[in-house]
Amino acid sequence: MKMFNVKRLIGALVVCGLTMAVTAAPAHAGLVLGITDGNTVLSIADGSGFDNDGAVGGVGYSGAIGIWTLVMSTGDSDPIEPAPYPHMHLSVSARSSAASVSGNTTGLGDLFVSLTDTDFTTNAAQYKMSIGGSTNGTVTAGDWRDNGNIEFGSGIPLNTVGPLGSGGYSANVSSAWFTTAPALGYSVTIGSLFHNGSAGTSSGDFDLSTTTRAVPEPASLSLLGLGLVGLATRARRLQGKKQ
């Protein structure tokens, strides 16, 4: 994908994170939905007064922001989505009154919608991002892991796709394997950037799921190492007999 889109995704995450730092939220916010057009920033925590989804592990918003006259977005995490975790799903439908302007900060800008959750300890883990939807412009998406356990943290980029469009779009990508996790947990975030080419509606579903595998215990690793040493020794002996 184009580098400027990666920078814009991360920049929007930073804005959402700074807003959360100065906005009151429930004691155990955990799951947070972030929405910005580059001018206005909305952060909706699970269980807050702005959350129109009453379920624990689900957050929702419906309203207007800038030229985006109707934005409907929902986000789910555990315990709604099935294990293993993290497993998050973000759904967005956004209607604009005009074409959006990339990089604009006066209310005409593209729409960035993201979902973040914290306190994950899954190890080992590989993260898959699956997206699909339709647009009259382009859509860019990415997901991140942050070992500082920060909401909207972008410490470790996992996957990025796009810009995709116009028309229908879909993609499936997977990250590298992670074999260690911080003791206090880590956060994950999935984000989507909508650029409308004209007035109209764009939509998308964005899923972040996790694949796990067993991590060998130290004793098992030692046995594996001894096995390799034995095989190497036998190979050298056989080679010596052939000479």
How would you describe each model-predicted region?
Residues H28-A214:
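Helix-boundary and membrane-interface capping/anchor signal
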Residues Y127, G227, A235-R237:
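Short linear functional motifs in flexible/disordered or boundary regions
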Residues G137, V229-R234:
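Short, electropositive, low-hydrophobicity segments enriched in small/polar residues
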